[in-house]
Amino acid sequence: MHRLVVALVTLIGLTGAVFLAGYFLLFSASNDRAAALAPADSVFYFNVYLQPSSGQQMNLGGLIGRLPGFADEASLDEKVDQVVQNLLGASGLGLDYREQIKPWLGSQIAVAGRPADGDPTQPDAVFIVEVKDRALAEAALGELATQGGFSFTAETYQGVEIQTADTGAYAFVGEMLVVGESSVGVESVIDVDRGAAALAGREDFRTTMAGLPADHLASAFVDLGALAEATGTADQLSAFSTAGAALIAERDGIRLSGSAPFEIDDASASSAAGFGLGGEPSSLVDWMPEDTIAELVIFGLRQTLEDAEDAAASAPDGEQITSALDTVRALASFGFGIDIDADLLPLLDREVGIALSGLGGALPSGQILLRPEDPEAAEAALVRVVDRLVATGASERTEEGPGAEITVLSISQVGEIAYAVRDGVIILGLGAEDVSAALQAHADGRALGGSDRYAQTFEVAGERAGNEAFVDIGAVVDLMGATFELPDDARDILAQIGSFGFTAPSRDDRLEFHAVLTVDEP
């Protein structure tokens, strides 16, 4: 895409960044003018508002004020402008945000993607930007084109002048600037302005957006049904039709919340089973040591893997994937005598957790925790796996742990793998110390699930059930040390970020998700 279009797209992308754009992206009631111009066959739609609302402005101002260098509210506007300007400068586009963009930029920016040549997997994206001063916008676009050495040809479509080049086009449709990769996308918006069906008129779009929190910073809509049909995954995603999400500023962090209607009568048996498990909060976090810095819990992992394999089999080039999986099964069977489907998958049929607490030399320290549907059958399957590994040359010993016996396997060219079983939970680690740490955390009640940082993260999320993830951002940055080369100001800002959390609860007839990024007090 030529320099002008890249410049506008870059601006829109920068405006969508969580904290910088967060200062601007403040909800402006119900006047979504861009959705009224987006084509009805759009498969995705992202929208942000630049008009402040008092509650969101207060929360965002407080969050940004916690970051190093942003504590002075009087100069907050200037500092945010400077950061945006620096980012544009780093892009190499030669744009001056204060002089060339900010004076004409209105209160709304949106992007809609519609099928190119009827293929939803190859959407033709158009950007719809509200303009508060068209004369300034036209002058700025002309200046940007001159700076880039590009020339445009004017053509008229349904009474609207479109400026076109080999790799991009733009037009003013009323008070909106429409930018596309080609004139086709721009023409589709003009068609809507002249009476063609709009995304805003779709019942599923209105229903999805009405289900989002009213006071938000930005919103998104995805036509899952169209994408599933186009990608050959309609059977696996038959229970889903659309999805929507909203970005919200809370007092202690930024929250992205969304949902997708779930038609259980249309779902496959495995999808329905996985959905049913998502209504309960994870219990495995009560076994993870308090110093855990990152964790992931998945409910129904077995069902997810089986669904993914079925989807791969029906996808283009899926035969290569299924053939590779068959090879893995054969190697496990002939090399170790392990039947993956009978011995390993039953361990993953309910709740699976991974916890990371640090790096010990070249290997991570942490645990894999399993709470299977049938603990006794799963433990028997685990014993079979151990017996077969011992039969192929591994050595086995046992140690006493806090409340449970720990079995340690030493496998040539692999190292040590330890495990213990207690209260229906299987704990695995790369050594007895990791397993013992989990047993001790549960016995003492000093586990991650009871820590303040974990509790605060999911308090901002407002929910905790189903699949989840947690990352202590500051601890991870400290752990990585000099591994990442970051500017000092970026490292200071990351140090002020508290944690990331994600949860995906099942609620009645919908699947929700909530992702949060917290910001610590100075």
Where are these regions (language model features)?
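Short, surface-exposed charged micro-motifs
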Residues: 34, 112, 168-169, 244-248, ...
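Short, hydrophobic/proline-enriched secondary-structure or compact coil segments at domain edges
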Residues: 123, 176-177, 245, 250-265, ...
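Structural boundary/hinge residues at secondary-structure and domain interfaces
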Residues: 2-125, 129-161, 205-240, 251-362, ...
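Single conserved position on a long alpha-helix in the C-terminal lobe of the eukaryotic protein kinase
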Residues: 44-46, 93-207, 345-456, 515
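Extended, charge-rich low-complexity interaction segments
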Residues: 74-80, 183-184, 328-330, 421-440, ...
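Long, C-terminal catalytic modules of enzymes
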Residues: 413, 432-433, 439-522
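Active-site lining segments that contact anionic ligands and/or coordinate catalytic metals
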Residues: 253-255, 291-293, 351, 363-365, ...
